[in-house]
Amino acid sequence: MYKGIVQLVIGLMMIVTLLVGYLPIPEYLVELTCVSNMLGGVLLTIDGILSICRKKNLSSNLYRAVCVCILTVFFICLGSLTGFFHFNFKGAFFFLHVINPIAFVGCYLLFCNDAERRIVSAANFITPVLMLVYLLFDYIRCQFTGKFVYGFAEPDVLTFP
């Protein structure tokens, strides 16, 4: 019961901070910050409800896939502290870039039972798929718009011959 309540509260916090941060600027809804926080919030909310009502849990494979995305956001934000690029840490974006990733990974570490999972398993190959799909989406979007979502690289450099 405690686990489900914590998951539900953190999941709803992630969704609410996402809505507060991104509703005024809907053109940025394609950012990985938005996508990973929304997926993480929905995953925690659904898992919390299932845990409270039916005493069931979602697969830890889903948690790992979202962890890859949300930790990518977190580590890029840590890299922004070097001063090479700028990220918005004001208001809800502080939660989206710092607090929510830490809370989501904390939920994964505390509530997902991966102790009996083998290190080499076919299910582990699913983990990076979500991140790879997002990168493919960003590349295809760049082909249509002429710019990447975050603009870390010039489109001319990353084209196929």
Each predicted region: which residue ranges?
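Hydrophobic cores of alpha-helical transmembrane segments in multi-pass inner/ER membrane proteins
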Residues: 10, 36-49, 99-111
